[in-house]
């Protein structure tokens, strides 16, 4: 069963671009190494451009757990966290229905 993780966070004022750049680096450096990764979406709020929501889809919870426990992933997250006001608010779950065009 596919696994979805969603997290919401706010960038420190003036560090919005650093957050976006961090996700771009993840795509270039981490994504090719991550087994089971399907897709991700990084979105910023229409009401506050420093507020973000990320949704990441993996083929299974096992793939998600393998990535989240990887030391390189941990280092990437700590770099991202240095640009955030507080720890993200997380949601992890099983995909019950997935609709695409």
Residues covered by each model-derived region:
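Glycine-rich beta-strand-turn "strand-cap" elements at beta-sheet edges
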Residues: 1, 39-50, 76-101
């Amino acid at each position: 069963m596919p696994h979805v993780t969603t997290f919401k966070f706010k960038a420190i004022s003036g560090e919005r671009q650093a957050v976006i750049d961090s996700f771009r680096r993840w795509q270039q450096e981490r994504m090719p190494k991550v087994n089971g990764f399907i897709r991700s979406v990084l979105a910023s709020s229409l009401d506050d451009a420093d507020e973000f929501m990320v949704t990441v889809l993996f083929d299974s919870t096992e793939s998600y757990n393998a990535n989240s426990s990887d030391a390189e992933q941990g280092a990437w997250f700590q770099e991202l966290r240095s640009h955030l006001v507080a720890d993200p608010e997380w949601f992890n779950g099983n995909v019950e229905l997935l609709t695409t065009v």
